[in-house]
Regions:
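N-terminal beta1-alpha1-beta2 submodule of the flavodoxin-like/Rossmannoid cofactor-binding fold
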Residues: 17-109, 119-121, 126, 130, ...
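Bacterial Sec-dependent N-terminal signal peptides
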Residues: 1-24
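Short amphipathic alpha-helical segments and helix-helix/interface helices
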Residues: 126-131, 154-158
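Short, glycine/serine-rich, charged loops/turns that create anion-binding
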Residues: 11-12, 42-44, 146
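Short, glycine-/small-residue-rich phosphate/pyrophosphate-handling segment
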Residues: 140-176
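Glycine-rich, N-terminal phosphate-binding loop of Rossmann-like dinucleotide-binding domains
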Residues: 114-115
Length: 187
């Protein structure tokens, strides 16, 4: 009797673990494209969306970081003297970047994530776009925002960088599942 119970329990465990593996595999996209998910995030909101996209499409995460990290005082958009306010009101501001260097030759598709600041992408994103050669790449913007749409920021990006091939953009203020589902649909 113990052997029958043992066999039954073993089969039950095996079938449950097999089903769990299949469910995990179904959430990921198999693509022959090499994907980078580059994002700028100061509070973690955009980072969560970027992480969900990278996990779903099998992309490498890359955090766009300024050479000097932002403090909470730097991000105080109500203070006209704050770093973010000065950067965003100075159209040609291009803050120096830190972090590891990239070889974009390794990638076909770049998801580009950022929060909406002053109805635009933050200036470090502009620095990133001007630092690297995006020839032959497709750049797919996504953003997070407390109240703005992505439309104006993408319009500005297309105007400033007309040689880049831009993919379908999306504002991702929902769940991380929404971010992953959208990413699967645009690859």
């Amino acid at each position: 009797m113990k052997q029958i119970i043992f066999i039954f329990m073993s089969l039950l465990c095996f079938s449950c673990s097999s089903k769990a593996q299949n469910q995990t595999a179904d959430t990921n996209v198999q693509s022959d494209k090499k994907i980078l998910v580059a994002y700028f995030s100061c509070t973690g909101t955009t980072e969560k969306a970027a992480d969900a996209i990278a996990k779903t499409v099998g992309g490498k995460l890359y955090h766009i970081t300024p050479a000097t990290a932002n403090t909470s005082a730097d991000l105080d958009w109500n203070n006209k003297s704050s770093r973010s306010s000065i950067e965003m009101t100075t159209e040609n501001s291009r803050p120096e970047l830190g972090g590891e260097a990239l070889n974009l030759k390794d990638y076909d598709v770049i998801f580009l994530g950022y929060p909406i600041w002053w109805n635009l992408c933050p200036r470090p994103v502009n620095t990133f776009l001007e630092k690297y050669d995006f020839s032959g790449k497709t750049v797919i913007p996504f953003a997070t925002s407390g109240g703005s749409s992505i439309t104006n920021s993408v319009k500005q990006l297309k105007k400033l960088y007309p040689k880049i091939v831009w993919g379908e953009s999306r504002l991702l203020n929902g769940s991380v599942k929404q971010a992953g589902d959208w990413a699967k649909g645009v690859i």
